[in-house]
A protein has these predicted regions:
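Conserved class I S-adenosyl-L-methionine
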Residues: 1-44, 130-156
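Class I SAM-dependent methyltransferase SAM/SAH-binding core
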Residues: 49-90
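A C-terminal cap/extension of S-adenosyl-L-methionine-dependent methyltransferases
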Residues: 187-240
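Acceptor-substrate binding/catalytic loop of class I
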Residues: 157-173
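A short acidic, Gly/Pro-enriched loop at the edge of an enzyme's catalytic core
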Residues: 89-101
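A short SAM/SAH-binding and catalytic strip from SAM-dependent methyltransferases
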Residues: 100-114
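A short glycine-rich, Lys/Arg-flanked "PGG" loop and its adjoining helix->strand segment in the class I
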Residues: 114-129
C-alpha cells in the first residue's frame, strides 16, 4: 500500500478548530455513536494504561491509570498530559506497553492497515483489548460504484469544505490482518447503515435522522454487514 501525503493531513488537522464539524450531520452522528460505544465499555479502562491512537486530544471521559495520546497533529494533543506526535504506523513504544488501546474516528483509513494493526498489536499486552473503528467499502453509500465491496481502495470525499483522500477497506480485508496479528474479534458494531442508502434519494440531514433505525436493523444479517462504519472490540490472543 502506498502512503498518502501525511504533511497535508497533518496541516489540515492542525489548522481546523475542532475534529468533528458541528454543522456536519453525518460526522456528528459518527461522533455520537463512537462516544456512546466507549461509554458502554468504560469498565475496560479502570486502573489500566491506555494508548489513545489518533486521539485528536479527546479522552472520551475515560478514567484510567494513565493515558498516552498519539496523533500526527500536535496542535490537537499538545495540551494533553502525555502526548507524542507520531503516526500509528510506527509507534515509539516498547512491545507490550499498554493494557488497552482506543483507535477510532476512522484513523485507520489514513494508514497502511497492515502496518498500523501490526503496531497496535505489538504495543498491546497479551489479553489486552482494542476498540478499533474503520470505514468499510461494504457501506451502502458506495452501492453502484467501483469502490463497493473492494478489498482495499482509495476514495476522495469532502469534509469541512475540503477534499480528502483516504483508504477504504472491506471488513474481510481487515479481519484477515487482525487474525495475522493475533487479534480476536469479541464484538462487531456497524453504524451508518440505512443512511448510506437513503442518502442517494434524500438529503444527508434527513438520511441521518432516519438512521436511528440502525439500532434495530444492525442485528439483521442482511443489513449488519453493510455498515459504512464498523466498531470492533478486539482481544490480543496468547500465542506460545
Amino acid at each position: 500500500m502506498s502512503e498518502f501525503d501525511l504533511s497535508k493531513i497533518k496541516e489540515f488537522y492542525n489548522r481546523i478548530p475542532e475534529i468533528w464539524a458541528p454543522d456536519d450531520a453525518w460526522h456528528t452522528y459518527s461522533h455520537h455513536e463512537l462516544d456512546h460505544y466507549i461509554k458502554q465499555h468504560m469498565n475496560l479502562f479502570e486502573d489500566t494504561r491506555v494508548l489513545n491512537a489518533g486521539s485528536g486530544g479527546n479522552d472520551y471521559g475515560i478514567s484510567c491509570k494513565e493515558m498516552y495520546h498519539v496523533d500526527i497533529a500536535e496542535e490537537k494533543v499538545k495540551n494533553c498530559k502525555n502526548y507524542i506526535v507520531s503516526s500509528i504506523e510506527k509507534l515509539p513504544f516498547p512491545d507490550e506497553s499498554f493494557d488497552n488501546i482506543i483507535c477510532v474516528g476512522s484513523v485507520l483509513n489514513y494508514c497502511d492497515a497492515f502496518q498500523a494493526i501490526s503496531e497496535l498489536s505489538r504495543v498491546l499486552k497479551k489479553s489486552g483489548k482494542i476498540i478499533l473503528e474503520f470505514e468499510s467499502s461494504w457501506g451502502y453509500e458506495y452501492l453502484n460504484t467501483k469502490e463497493y465491496k473492494a478489498p482495499v481502495t482509495v476514495i476522495t470525499l469532502e469534509y469541512m469544505h475540503e477534499q480528502h483522500t483516504q483508504w477504504l477497506f472491506s471488513p474481510e480485508y481487515i479481519y484477515k490482518i487482525l487474525k495475522q496479528y493475533n487479534l480476536k474479534i469479541l464484538e462487531q458494531t456497524p453504524f451508518h447503515i440505512l443512511d448510506g442508502l437513503l442518502s442517494k434519494i434524500l438529503s444527508e440531514e434527513l438520511s441521518v435522522k432516519l438512521t436511528q433505525i440502525d439500532h434495530i436493523i444492525k442485528n439483521w444479517p442482511i443489513f449488519r454487514k453493510h455498515g459504512n462504519n464498523i466498531i470492533l472490540l478486539l482481544e490480543k490472543s496468547f500465542v506460545p
